[in-house]
Structures are given as C-alpha cells and as structure tokens.
Amino acid sequence: VIGGDLLNQIISASFAVKDYEGSYVGVYGACSTMAESMLVGGCMIDGGFADKTVCVTSSHFCSAERQYRFPLEMGTQRTPTAQWTVTGAGGALLSSEGRGPVLESGTFGTVIDMGVSDANNMGAAMAPAASSTICAHFEATKTTPQDYDLILTGDLGMLGKKITLELVRRSGYELEG
C-alpha cells in the first residue's frame, strides 16, 4: 500500500493501514499525493519490487482548513484565491498483469519557489511547479497536449489555473481548446 493524506504525519493513511500486515509506504504531496503514490507504485512494479500496489489518498475539508488556513469556527471570510479542499478518498490498484488502463509513463516534478507566502493563494505558489512538470512531461515523452484526453493537476484555484495555463503557453504548449 502506498498512500497519504493532508494531515500532519499522514495520520489518516497511517491509521487506515495499522492492522495491515503488508508493506506500507507513506507519501505526502498535498494535492499531488494520488499522482505521487501511483508514480511510486508504477516504479515499484516496473523495477520488479512488487507485482501489485494499492495507491490511496484522502482529504477532509474541515481538517485541511484548520491545518492550512483558519478553523471554520473562527468564521473567517475566505479570500477569492483560497482553495476548496475536497472531503473524499480515492484509490487505484496497479498490477503487472491484466487488461485495465495502463500507467504508461509519469514525470516527477521539482520544487519551484517563487516566493509566494500567502497561505490563501496556494494556487499561485503551486502554478510554477505544475507548469514545469507538465512541460517536462511533454518533452520527456515527446508528446503534446493533443495526445491526452485529460490533463489534471491538484486544486490550483482560479488564479493558479490561469497562471499555469500562461506559463505552459509561454513554453510553447496550448492546454485550452
């Protein structure tokens, strides 16, 4: 099992597997946790270290608000750039055999810090790394946006999405349309 969540010490994921007798790798990538767990799982399978991996993530709106922004009980007004964390969970079983969808390739990103320090505008903070990773993936795989049915990121918010689209456009790729 490879998994994580948005809370300190990935406590939810760790407690979820506490009685599981197999191996567990905890990952913490905030908005990228699901993609990160699937990339790690795919690498483990491709490298011959596992035949199957279960990749999971979860998040909880109120817990994320308390940890990253303001507890809801404070009644603080949200800024227009604040993200909306989902309350939910998801998982995927990756296997070295079968006929399901295929994890064909993936690209690990890099940290790009442009100095954004507003905790209510994490989309602007994440946009440079998101756009860099998207473009690096196109270059590494010799693909273009038209080769994909869907390109997803974590919640960049409206402003972060706008910044990401512009940065990707400056690199020569058009994601809209």
Model-predicted segments: where are they?
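Active-site-proximal alpha-helical scaffold in enzymes
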Residues: 27-55, 94, 128
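Acidic, glycine-rich active-site loops and adjacent beta-strand->loop/helix elements
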Residues: 5-9, 31-32, 57-63, 109
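Condensing-enzyme catalytic core mediating Claisen C-C bond formation in acyl metabolism
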Residues: 71-135, 140-143, 177
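Conserved beta-ketoacyl condensing-enzyme motif
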Residues: 1-29, 147-159
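A glycine- and small-aliphatic-rich helix-loop capping segment at beta-alpha/alpha-beta transitions
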Residues: 13-23, 45-47, 68-77, 168-173
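Short acidic, glycine/serine/threonine-rich loops at helix termini
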Residues: 12-14, 39, 64-69, 162-164
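Long, repeat-rich segments with strong aromatic
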Residues: 135-167
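Structural signature of cysteine-dependent C-C bond-forming condensing enzymes
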Residues: 47-57, 100-101, 140, 171-177
